Swiss-Prot record:
InterPro entries: Allrgn_V5/Tpx1_CS (IPR018244), CAP_dom (IPR014044), CAP_sf (IPR035940), CRISP-related (IPR001283), V5_allergen-like (IPR002413). Residues 45-189 form the SCP domain. Its main location: secreted. Expressed by the venom gland. This is Venom allergen 5. Belongs to the CRISP family. Venom allergen 5-like subfamily.
Length: 204
């Protein structure tokens, strides 16, 4: 795959072209470890799918107001090594936030990021970071359109349960910055969710 040839809708140079390798590039931050184990990948995928099915079955009582309506077109996600590679390249820059260009040949790619820190030498399990995204459901108003909700409060949740998204792949890095032990998780989603003129899923 020649990522340097991919033209993203938002412009910019593709992350996998710009940085080009899995070598961490974190300046004065001390890298402890990077990458996800096979088990962690399975756990992250299972957490996404368990949550999507909880929403689909109408079992999510949280919301503003809750509960969330059940879905009729919510499929399970599958893991994508390609999306995971691009997510890992971005995570390895130790820059919290979204990269500009991460699309792949077949579709636009969405992204969720999470960062936790502790003064103690402990690092949160990646599933805990995924649950932080799920918790945004408490601010979601299902009686309003997606575009009428406050995106800054709910955007990670909505990407997680976006029905048209089929694949997910994530990357992770743990590093120390000014005595803070940080765990940074990046998940990429394809096809991307969070389109302003669409809805999360079809309600039953």
């Amino acid at each position: 795959n020649n990522y340097c040839k991919i033209k993203c809708l938002k412009g910019g140079v593709h992350t996998a072209c710009k940085y080009g390798s899995l070598k961490p590039n974190c300046g004065n931050k001390k890298v402890v470890s990077y990458g996800l184990t096979k088990q962690e990948k399975q756990d992250i995928l299972k957490e996404h799918n368990d949550f999507r099915q909880k929403i689909a079955r109408g079992l999510e009582t949280r919301g503003n107001p809750g509960p969330q309506p059940p879905a009729k077109n919510m499929k399970n996600l599958v893991w994508s090594d390609e999306l995971a590679y691009i997510a890992q390249v971005w995570a390895n820059q130790c820059q919290y936030g979204h990269d500009t260009c991460r699309d792949v040949a077949k579709y636009q790619v969405g992204q969720n990021v999470a960062l936790t820190g502790s003064t103690a030498a402990v690092y949160n399990d990646p599933v805990k970071l995924v649950k932080m995204w799920e918790d945004e459901v408490k601010d979601y108003n299902p009686k309003k359109k997606f575009s009428e909700n406050n995106f800054l409060k709910i955007g990670h949740y909505t990407q997680m349960v976006w029905a048209n998204t089929k694949e997910v792949g994530c990357g992770s890095i743990k590093y120390i910055q000014e005595n803070w032990h940080k765990h940074y998780l990046v998940c990429n989603y394809g096809p991307s969710g969070n389109f302003q003129n669409e809805e999360l899923y079809q309600t039953k």
